[in-house]
Amino acid sequence: MANRGDLQKKTHTKKRPLHNIYGKEILSKRLEAENFPRTTLSFYRYVILENVQELRNRLYVEWEALGVLGRIYVAREGINAQLSIPSHNLNSFKENLNSRIQFKDMLLKIAVEDDHRSFLKLDLKVRNKIVADGLNDDAFDVTNVGKHLSAEEFNRCMEDKNSIVVDVRNHYESEIGHFENAILPQSDTFREELQILLELLNGKEDHKILMYCTGGIRCEKASAWLKHHGFKDVNQLHGGIISYAHEISQKGLESKFRGKNFVFDGRLQETIGNEIISVCHQCGKKSDRHINCSNPGCHILFIQCDDCSEKFEGCCTEECKTVLHLPKEKQKEIRKGKSNENRFFTKSKIRPKISELYRNRKPFETA
């Protein structure tokens, strides 16, 4: 029979939470206190995974023990990860991946630039898909992807007059950096872009299509989608812009990428070339400084130069600047849509649509 002490121990034993429980301030202080370097990297793989929730929980325990921070999506169709890890644990992390046949010999794309502050927490989620594409995967062969090209091959193919270079990223990514003469669909999401591509490339089915994205994952699905719709010569940049930057540096190749590479972490961008090709959304001055609007009810991502940052206090509009100076409780009321005062600042006004910021642009633009 168990004694009272044993019963008390069982009563007070709590299951360890398999998610972050700390706020941004605490997480930031922890990261600042680290006295070792971190390595930022990304990887993905389309592979059938079983018992996804159980796998997610095991990965969380194992990767948290290695000090991994980042954003990882797992789904029945595979894994998509952007993360940072203490550099001294990198080999252990590779061993962890190789211990599972589904993740063995994973191509890890190391960040071009790294300030060791790319992520604050470990965020590992189960999703229906590792990239939101809005497609019915049963309707076409998702494994029939385009031909993978090295940086050298991609450069050479760009010289072919029959080639069409297509950026498979969102407009806010391509705005600060893209390949020479690339077609830049003005889409807000990958789901939108896939539909736009068919319209944009209509009648070009016999051309050589050269696709690229940040790390390669979006090209996997987009290339299969185009091949399903009759495109005969579909190619994609192996490892995306990240691998391209490393290869041209290692081999001394000419870079045909202009500007910076947008990344989905705290860094927001990596320098590929020194050229600034984008402009401040507010004054039109040359700038590639991406920030989120300082108004918590907006938080829209946009480009703002230093002068406009000071003028608008980090906000995207005068309206957001006005909201920023309201009492905190009033701001909360506005965000919840409960305030009857200052009706101009409704949620739709606080969070302007991208299409409004870009209302003077055409649906499709070429670099």
Curated annotation (Swiss-Prot):
One of its GO terms (biological process) is tRNA modification. The keyword Transcription does not apply. Its EC number is 1.14.-.-. It catalyses: uridine(34) in tRNA + AH2 + O2 = 5-hydroxyuridine(34) in tRNA + A + H2O. GO terms for molecular function: oxidoreductase activity, acting on paired donors, with incorporation or reduction of molecular oxygen. Pfam families: Rhodanese, Rhodanese_C, UPF0176_N. The keyword tRNA processing applies. InterPro entries: Rhodanese-like_dom, Rhodanese-like_dom_sf, Rhodanese_C, TrhO, TRHO_N. The active site is at C213 (cysteine persulfide intermediate). Gene3D superfamilies: 3.30.70.100, Rhodanese-like domain (3.40.250.10). Residues 159-249 form the Rhodanese domain. Keywords: Oxidoreductase, tRNA processing. Belongs to the TrhO family. Catalyzes oxygen-dependent 5-hydroxyuridine (ho5U) modification at position 34 in tRNAs. HAMAP family: TrhO. This is tRNA uridine(34) hydroxylase. It comes from Leptospira borgpetersenii serovar Hardjo-bovis (strain JB197). The gene is trhO.
